[in-house]
Amino acid sequence: DRLQNMKDRCAELGLTLVETTTPDPMSDAGTSGTQQFVLEDVPRAVDQYGTETAFFGTNTSQQEPMIKCVVNTKSYFTMPSDPSPFVGFPSALGIEVPADKLYDSDYMMNAISEKLAEADMTGHMGTWTAPLMTLFMTGSYAYAEAFCEGKTNGEKLDAEVFKQTLSEAAGGEVDVENITDGGTTYDNGFFIMCSYERF
């Protein structure tokens, strides 16, 4: 469980983890209620805990207002819940994206770095170098293509080729590990971890 892993790691590092519950964007408050809460709560938390506070949200609708507030308060943002340079960053930082750069990760990573440097926020935010959902689609398609062309070991899932197709789709090394839950390891279920870049 992600939250428990975060708690355990914070305990190892001597950090305090503070949980906050925002209004559910699927509730009557809607996305605007969630975003308004974040816009009010992040500055309040920085006032209480200081600028060394790092924020993480578990819902996509939280990301844009959280990034805006982190820049304004000079605090920290670990990364979007669905790691991607395209989640929250462009609108929060006012990045204009030309039509020919809409899906260009390198362009977006550079644009984010520049905007954060202008705001004296270098080192305060990060994300994966490849968008998670695009990586899943592109890498999985490339794997299916390799399978159909006989470029795998013939099994339903050739873990080495799968890792290779994901890494190529990400433009960098992707760590792939089988999911183990309750003592059972699943051959067709994976945890993946892309390269993390701190801006």
How would you describe each model-predicted region?
Residues 1-199:
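A residue-level marker of the well-folded mature domains of exported/periplasmic proteins
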